[in-house]
Amino acid sequence: MLVKTYSAAVIGLEATTITIEVNITRGGTFHLSGLADTAVKESYDRISAALPNVGFKTPTANLTINLSPADLKKEGSGFDLPMAIGILGADGKIDSGRLEKYMLIGELGLDGKLKPVRAVLPIAIKARKEKFNGLIVPVDNIREAAVVNNLDVYGMENLADVIAFLNGTGKYEPMVVDTRKEFYEQQYTHELDFSDVKGQEGVKRVLEVAAAGSHNVCLIGPPGSGKSMMAKRLPSILPPLSLAESLETTQIHSVAGKLGKNVSLISQRPFRSPHHTLSQVAMTGGTTKAMPGEVSLAHNGILFLDELPEFSKQTLEVLRQPLEDRKIIISRANYSVEYPCSFMFVASMNPCPCGYYGDPTHHCVCTPGQIQRYLSKISGPLMDRIDLHVEVPVVPFKDLSKMAPGEPSSTIRERVIRARKIQEERFKPFKGVYANAQMTERMLHQFAEPDAASLDMLRMAMERLKLSARAYSRILKVARTIADLEGTEKVQSQHIAEAIGYRNLDRSDWAERGV
């Protein structure tokens, strides 16, 4: 008897419907076809152990299973459930008429329990698109799948529950999630707040500008100056995620298997802070399964690299394309995958290996050669892609003990949101552009054209600091953001002057140190 069940395979962020054809005839052999990987090939062993543990015998007849389309690689243990149901259907133990109405996904334990799998959200989106009556998933995946509206999602504890449901002998209700309500209920106040930061008003201003225009920023200063402390508080002044951004971000984390148990939506902007031992592949994504890397996991949020020169030069150089294109393409032998990676790049670094170059309170023990080797790990093209780089001085103890709490994040965030709304209105005609940092050269001419005085100032800065054309564009983008924070329609000379002041690493004294 031939029976068909349905599941899905996920490549990148896209799911493809997989038809599992199960045929039982006389004999005693097992055949599996359809370009299955090792985990799928091992499914029959798990199914054979699970069936007796839920009260069913494993068929001893000749069993052939085909996963179609045959030219698409099938990976992972999520095909356990649809294969097991197909075997029981072909053996006459399940009403085969109901099988075509549901998509199934889930790993089987030897005791018959359903274990969670990754990438359930893209599969749920595909099930709705293909107009299946419902999706059956492990109970631990139910909230992730149920955020897809207009699709009945059933979370099951074990194989016996699925069999009872398909035979109509058990009453199971689909999980209903009000996606919009769920999203807003999960938003919370950040625990880290800029009011904790004493002093550093100039650096806070830089971070406010960065947040307002989604600009990349690098903080340079000695140990203990508060670089990491302020970077970790940057999410608290960013605009909240929109529902569309939340769904897109959740989908990436779902594919990567990074969603926690019973998590339905990511409602906060991601803040990724990988260790400096991070590999090139872990940064961009890859492995044999073309999984998302740190640049994609930071999509719609922040990628923070603490102690930037400690990362390998190869790892840092692969950031150049994602920072420019805001997407990453991972190519394999017979397919390629594209992931979005539109993030704010935030870096911190010491000025030298010992950390105290230029610090008036500590003596630097590094030789000029050591400083040059340390800073040369950061290439000019990478630094060009960072809009703002600013020095972070140490706050003296006498000032720390006297200073009142700083301005709270909520106040700064209000100004940032006002500036972002101006940008959203400005860029409405341009698809995929929502912040000044994303402006093209043509948009710069339209929205950030400097006046004659500003142009002279820029020309002098370009000549003295030997700036690249890319740095010129970055200065204009930052100046446009400063003008938006002030509510000014035109970019003026004071905005240009402030933006030039945020190019610390372009100054000659830094250039002499090897940057």
Sequence positions of predicted segments:
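Peripheral, non-AAA+ core regions of ATP-driven protein-machinery
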Residues: 1-218, 225-228, 331, 471-472, ...
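Short beta-strand elements
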Residues: 18-24, 283, 387-390
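Basic, amphipathic alpha-helical bundle interface domains used for macromolecular binding and assembly
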Residues: 33-44, 59, 66-76, 290, ...
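P-loop NTPase nucleotide-binding/switch module
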Residues: 170-209, 213, 240-295
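Walker A/P-loop
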Residues: 219-260, 325
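The Walker A (P-loop) glycine that initiates the GxxxxGKT/S ATP-binding motif of P-loop NTPases
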Residues: 221, 285, 307
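Walker B catalytic acidic pair
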Residues: 300, 306-307, 318
